[in-house]
Amino acid sequence: MEGVMENVGGLMQNIRRRHMSITEMTEESVRLGVAQMDTGFKKIKEMSIMVLETGLRLPGLLFIELLWRYQGFSFEDISDDMMKQTPLSYFDIPTMLDFVHRRNFDHHAAIILSYFVIFISLMFLTLPLSRLIRMYSHFLSVFLFGVAYKLSAIYVDLEMKTGEEELKLDGLIKLERHGFHFLAQMLLVVLQSMLLEVDGEPWRVALPVFALPIVARMCGCPMDKLKNAHNYACTGTMIFIATYMLYRAPSLIKSTKTALRQIKAVFMVHGLADGVAVLWRKLRILELLTFTWITMFLMVLYVELIDKGRTWSEVGRILLTGVAETTNTPITLAALAVSVSYVCKWIADLTKLITGGTRSHGHVLAHSGYTEAVSVVILCIQTGFLGMQVEQKTILLALVLYIVISALLQSLFEIIEVVLLNLPSSPTASRARHARCICIALLLVVIPFFTTKTMLALLPIDIYTAIIIANSATVTARAIGVILKYIVLIVETKSEEPWEGIDDLTYYIDCANKGIELLAAKVVMVFGCMQVVKVGFSFATFAILLFHVIVNIYKRLEHTVSFIKNRNAAVKNINRLSKADVVQLREREDVCAICFIEMKEEARITPCKHYFHGPCLRKWLAVKMVCPLCYTYMKEDDFDSKSSSSGTLNEVQQNEEGAAVEENPENPEEQPEAPNAERAPGDMFDWDDLFGFRAERETRNRNEQRIHGARDMWPLLVDNDAYESDSDAGSEELVIEEENNN
C-alpha cells in the first residue's frame, strides 16, 4: 500500500512539474511577445519622431533656399512673369504682386527682413524638438490673432451695412448675430491660451481683445465709432504681442546660451571633425536635405502637370525639367546629391534583399550611394550647372543622371555577381532564390539597352555619351558572362566529381568578357580622338581621354595579360604533375582538401605528396603558387616528370614525408629550396630583385602565409586582384576558429 501511495505521489509531482513547466513556457512566450511588441513600437516611435522632426524643420531650409535664390532682387523687380516661373505659381499671383508692390519696402526694411528670415530659419534648424514644437505653437497663436482680426473686421462691416444707429437687443434673433461672433472670438481665445500655455490671469484677460467691437456695439456704441473700437483692439493686440515677447526674451536668451554651451561641450569631447559629425546626425541634415528637395520637386511637378496642363506623354522631359528648376543653389545641389545617394542605396539594399545577400555594406563607400552622389556634385561643379538656364540644365542633367545610372548598374552587377556565383555551392538555397537572382541578372542585361536608347533620343553623341554606352555594353556582357558561369557551375554541382572541362569554359567566358571590355574601351578612345580632330582640342576632353586610356585600357590590358599568363602557367604546371590511378585513390579513400568531394577516378599529386582534384588544383594555382594544405611554395623545378614513379613508390615517399612533416611542423621552412629559383610565370617585374632582397622577401611571405592558415579558400571565390586587395583579417579569423574547434 505504501508503494502504491509513493507511486501516486511521484506521479502527482511529475504532473505538477509538467504543469509548472508549461506555465513557465507560456509566461516566457508571452514575455518574448511583449518584448517584440515593445521593440516594434519603439521603432515606430523613433521613425515617427524622425519624420515629425524633419517635417517641422523643413521651413527653415526652404526660407534659406528662397532667400539665396532671390538675394540679388529688390521688391520692385519682382514681376508677374517671374512669379509664374516659381514653384508657387498656383497661388493668386496678381494679389501677391499687388501686396508686395503696395508695401513700398525701402532698402533698410529689406535688409532687416532678410536678417529676420535668417534668424527664424536658424531657429527652425537648430532648436530641439520640444522647443521647436513650442515655436510652432507661437506661430499658430499669431495666425489665430489674424483670424480674430478678420472676424472683427467682418463684424464691423456687417454692422455698418445694417444702418441701425442704435442697437436694440429686444429679441433673440437680434442677439443671435452678436452672440455667434462673440462665441467665435472666445473659442479662438481658448485655443490661444492652450497653445501659449499662459498661466496668469492678466494674460488671459488680454487675449480676447478683438471682442472689444462686439462688446462696444452691444453696449450702445454709435456706428461711426465702431471702427475706432476695432482699431483699439488692433492696438491692444500689438501691445500684447510686444509685452509677451519682452517677457519671454530672457528665457530665449537663456536657452540660446545653454545650446551654445552644449555645442561647445560636444566639440570639446569629440573634437572638431567628430563634433561636426555628431551635430550633423543630431540635426538630421541628410534627411532634411532629402525631404526639402523632394518637397520642392513635387511642387514643380504639380505646377507642370496641373497648372500648365502638360500631358503624361511628356513625363520624361517633365521630370528632367522639374529637377533642373529645383536645383538652383548650392543647397539644392547638395540636396539633389543626397537624394541620389539615398535612392541608389535603397535600390542596392532592395537588390540584396531580393537576392538574399547581406545588407551590410562592408565599406562606407561600398554600394551605399556615396559614389553616385559625389559624381553628381563633381560633374555639376565642373560644368557650371548652377549658372545655366533651365534648357541647358535639362540637357546637362540628363547626361549626369545617365552617368549615375551607369554607376548604379555597375554596383548592382557587383552585388549579383557574388551572390549568383555562390548559389550553386549552397545546398540550402531555394529555387525561388535562384529564380530571383537570375531575374536580377537578366534585368542587368536588358536595362542598359533601354537606357542607351532613351539617352540617344534625348542627347547628342559626344565623348560622355560614348563612355556611358561603352559602360552599358560592358555591364550587359558581364551579366551574360555571370549567367553562363552560373549555368556551368550548376552543371558541375550535379556531377559526382569535378568536371575536367569546366575550368576551360569559365576561362573562355572570362576571356570573352575581358575582350569585350577592351574593345569597348578602344572604340571610345577612337571616337574621342575623332572628336578632338573634328571639334577641336579642349582640356576637359583631353583629361577624360587620358584618364580613359590609363584606367580603362592600360590597366585592363595589364590585368588581362596577367590573368592569361597565370592561367596558362597553372595549366602547364598541372599537366606536369603526376596523376594518381584508380587503385591509389581507392586505397586512400580520401577527399579533396579544396572542394571536400571524394576522389574516385582522378587526382593530381603535388611535389609535397598531397592529393587534389586536377580542376580544383588548377584553379588554386592560377591564383597562388603554393600547396593548399601545407602552403609550400611550388617552384618551376618542382613541376617535372621525375617526380612521378610507380604507385607503390609514391605511397612510400608520401608516407615518409608526411611523417616527417608531422614530426617537425613548426619548421617547414627547413625544407631544401633552390637559392636561385626562377620567378613564377605571370609575376611582374619586382624592384626587390634589383637590390637582392627577393629571397628574404619570399621567405617572409611564406612564413606569414603558413601562419595565416593552410585552409584559405578565398582563391576559389575571387580573382587575383580581389584576393590581393583583400585584407588578411578574414583568413586569420578562419584559422582561429579551426584551432578552437580542434
Curated annotation (Swiss-Prot):
<dbReference type="InterPro" id="IPR025754">
    <property type="entry name" value="TRC8_N_dom"/>
</dbReference>
<dbReference type="GO" id="GO:0043161">
    <property type="term" value="P:proteasome-mediated ubiquitin-dependent protein catabolic process"/>
</dbReference>
<keyword id="KW-0808">Transferase</keyword>
<protein>
    <recommendedName>
        <fullName>RING finger protein 145 homolog</fullName>
        <ecNumber>2.3.2.27</ecNumber>
    </recommendedName>
</protein>
<keyword id="KW-0863">Zinc-finger</keyword>
<feature type="region of interest" description="Disordered">
    <location>
        <begin position="722"/>
        <end position="742"/>
    </location>
</feature>
<keyword id="KW-0479">Metal-binding</keyword>
<dbReference type="InterPro" id="IPR001841">
    <property type="entry name" value="Znf_RING"/>
</dbReference>
<feature type="transmembrane region" description="Helical">
    <location>
        <begin position="285"/>
        <end position="305"/>
    </location>
</feature>
<feature type="transmembrane region" description="Helical">
    <location>
        <begin position="138"/>
        <end position="158"/>
    </location>
</feature>
<feature type="transmembrane region" description="Helical">
    <location>
        <begin position="178"/>
        <end position="198"/>
    </location>
</feature>
<feature type="transmembrane region" description="Helical">
    <location>
        <begin position="438"/>
        <end position="458"/>
    </location>
</feature>
<dbReference type="GO" id="GO:0016020">
    <property type="term" value="C:membrane"/>
</dbReference>
<feature type="compositionally biased region" description="Acidic residues">
    <location>
        <begin position="659"/>
        <end position="672"/>
    </location>
</feature>
<dbReference type="InterPro" id="IPR013083">
    <property type="entry name" value="Znf_RING/FYVE/PHD"/>
</dbReference>
<comment type="function">
    <text>E3 ubiquitin ligase that catalyzes the direct transfer of ubiquitin from E2 ubiquitin-conjugating enzyme to a specific substrate. Acting downstream of probable Golgi transport protein eas-1, involved in inhibition of activation of transcription factor sbp-1, thereby playing a role in regulating AMsh glial cell size.</text>
</comment>
<feature type="zinc finger region" description="RING-type; atypical">
    <location>
        <begin position="592"/>
        <end position="630"/>
    </location>
</feature>
<dbReference type="GO" id="GO:0005801">
    <property type="term" value="C:cis-Golgi network"/>
</dbReference>
<dbReference type="GO" id="GO:0036503">
    <property type="term" value="P:ERAD pathway"/>
</dbReference>
<dbReference type="Pfam" id="PF13705">
    <property type="entry name" value="TRC8_N"/>
</dbReference>
<dbReference type="GO" id="GO:0005802">
    <property type="term" value="C:trans-Golgi network"/>
</dbReference>
<feature type="transmembrane region" description="Helical">
    <location>
        <begin position="109"/>
        <end position="129"/>
    </location>
</feature>
<keyword id="KW-0812">Transmembrane</keyword>
<feature type="transmembrane region" description="Helical">
    <location>
        <begin position="368"/>
        <end position="388"/>
    </location>
</feature>
<dbReference type="InterPro" id="IPR050731">
    <property type="entry name" value="HRD1_E3_ubiq-ligases"/>
</dbReference>
<dbReference type="GO" id="GO:0008270">
    <property type="term" value="F:zinc ion binding"/>
</dbReference>
<keyword id="KW-0472">Membrane</keyword>
<keyword id="KW-0333">Golgi apparatus</keyword>
<feature type="transmembrane region" description="Helical">
    <location>
        <begin position="318"/>
        <end position="338"/>
    </location>
</feature>
<feature type="transmembrane region" description="Helical">
    <location>
        <begin position="463"/>
        <end position="483"/>
    </location>
</feature>
<dbReference type="GO" id="GO:0061630">
    <property type="term" value="F:ubiquitin protein ligase activity"/>
</dbReference>
<keyword id="KW-0862">Zinc</keyword>
<feature type="region of interest" description="Disordered">
    <location>
        <begin position="642"/>
        <end position="684"/>
    </location>
</feature>
<feature type="transmembrane region" description="Helical">
    <location>
        <begin position="533"/>
        <end position="553"/>
    </location>
</feature>
<dbReference type="Pfam" id="PF13639">
    <property type="entry name" value="zf-RING_2"/>
</dbReference>
<keyword id="KW-1133">Transmembrane helix</keyword>
<dbReference type="InterPro" id="IPR011016">
    <property type="entry name" value="Znf_RING-CH"/>
</dbReference>
<feature type="transmembrane region" description="Helical">
    <location>
        <begin position="233"/>
        <end position="253"/>
    </location>
</feature>
<feature type="transmembrane region" description="Helical">
    <location>
        <begin position="395"/>
        <end position="415"/>
    </location>
</feature>
<dbReference type="GO" id="GO:0012505">
    <property type="term" value="C:endomembrane system"/>
</dbReference>
